[in-house]
Curated annotation (Swiss-Prot):
UDP-N-acetyl-alpha-D-glucosamine binds at T11, A12, G13, N125, R163, S197, Q289. GO terms for cellular component: plasma membrane. Cell wall formation. Catalyzes the transfer of a GlcNAc subunit on undecaprenyl-pyrophosphoryl-MurNAc-pentapeptide (lipid intermediate I) to form undecaprenyl-pyrophosphoryl-MurNAc-(pentapeptide)GlcNAc (lipid intermediate II). It is found in: Cell membrane. InterPro entries: GlcNAc_MurG, Glyco_trans_28_C, GlycoTrans_28_N. One of its GO terms (biological process) is carbohydrate metabolic process. Pathway: Cell wall biogenesis; peptidoglycan biosynthesis. HAMAP family: MurG. This is UDP-N-acetylglucosamine--N-acetylmuramyl-(pentapeptide) pyrophosphoryl-undecaprenol N-acetylglucosamine transferase. Pfam families: Glyco_tran_28_C, Glyco_transf_28.
Length: 367
């Protein structure tokens, strides 16, 4: 039976597609062995074992961004990580390494290459990260979420691998049950606010300032503030605050409108289910979130606003009227669904299994 090593993690944006592909591979080949490579600090340390997969860990190795002491220490630490992963590959008889970006992916790509094991890469964002740019150079196959992502001639659009709970979600059928389970009223317009697995301080700060004025219109708010954020619940009626949700499918099903960052994972989940959204791209980094959101905004399924412009006045002028306009929300829902995809996990699993099948035989490990 096949032994798969899936590498990636850190945030939900890396962990969720990894788990989606793992679930798809397990469903297709129940006797296979699926190992996950990550770090002890990442979200994978909790979610991977909870999903029933074995987690192997290496030290967290951020790529150095400037020539300093950390850069000097990086090279030997990276070399040690590659060696550690090569031993894992040999000892566990790994047949293919599948990388999703993040701290664990880059050394896994090199370890696989040096061990003669095929590499398959999935890139979630429109603008690829450093690890996956490296991985694409040695990969047998590359799956991308957005058309136009620059990862070489082997790149193929597969969409975002989504967890089965999202990919099979019938929003209309489960909305009332989802609201009941979350403690929400069944018939009120519902705004979901989420900044991703680590939260979004500026979104949190703005929404809490206008929560009472939003709920005064008769709406209700489910606000996922993120486990890493310091936040005080103001105690406003119909303003429901939680730190982190392991059941995002319930939160999504309950929502009429979402305010969210524009990470590829969140965006792909919302468009797959056809949820209208206000996207506030993360203003730091390489700008990939602003690129991610272009397609859904052009289709009419979302609104984009810069982080600096996402103020209480902006929310009152744009979010509140939209939340109370069912016809506009219905049009946005249809447009969002037109750019979403639900079968990314299946498409990605096809690439992985093709890579395994095309491998002629297990070569000797190069020392």
């Amino acid at each position: 039976m096949t032994v798969y090593l899936l590498a990636g993690g850190g945030t939900a944006g890396h962990v969720n597609p990894l788990l989606a592909v793992a679930d798809e591979l397990r469903a297709r080949e129940p006797g296979s062995t699926i190992l996950v490579l990550g770090t002890r600090e990442g979200l994978e340390s909790r979610l991977v074992p909870a999903r029933g997969y074995e987690l192997l860990t290496i030290a967290r190795l951020p790529f150095p961004r400037r020539p300093n002491g950390a850069a000097v220490r990086f090279a030997p630490a990276f070399t040690r990580a590659v060696g550690q992963i090569r031993r894992m590959i040999a000892e566990r008889g790994v047949d293919v390494v599948v990388g999703f970006g993040g701290y664990a992916a880059a050394p896994a790509y090199l370890a696989a290459r040096r061990s003669g094991v095929p590499v398959v890469v999935h890139e979630a964002n429109a603008s690829p990260g450093l690890a996956n740019r490296l991985g694409a150079r040695v990969a047998t196959a590359v799956g991308i979420t957005f058309p136009g992502t620059a990862l070489g001639p082997r790149a193929e659009v597969v969409g975002m691998p989504l967890r089965r709970e999202i990919a099979t979600l019938d929003r209309d059928a489960v909305r009332d049950a989802a609201r009941a389970e979350l403690g929400l009223d069944a018939d009120r317009p519902t705004l979901l606010v989420t900044g991703g697995s680590t939260g979004a301080r500026s979104l949190n700060r703005t929404v809490v300032q206008v929560a009472e004025r939003i709920t005064a219109t008769g709406a209700q708010i489910l606000h996922i503030v993120g486990g890493a954020q310091e936040f005080t619940d103001p105690g406003v009626e119909r303003y429901h605050v939680v730190g982190y949700s392991d059941r995002m499918e319930l939160a999504i099903a309950a929502a009429d409108l979402v305010v969210s960052r524009a990470g590829a994972g969140a965006l792909s989940e919302l468009t797959a289910v056809g949820i209208p959204a206000v996207y506030v791209p993360y203003p730091v980094g390489n700008g990939e979130q602003a690129v991610n959101v272009r397609g859904v905004v052009a289709a009419g399924g979302g609104i984009v606003v810069a982080d600096a412009d996402f103020t209480p006045d902006w929310v009152l002028a744009h979010v509140v009227p939209l939340l109370s306009d069912p016809a506009a929300l219905a049009r946005m829902s249809e447009a969002a669904a037109s750019v979403g995809t639900r079968d990314g996990a299946a498409r990605m699993a096809d690439l992985v299994r093709d890579a395994v099948a095309s491998r002629p035989s297990r070569p000797a490990v190069r020392r």
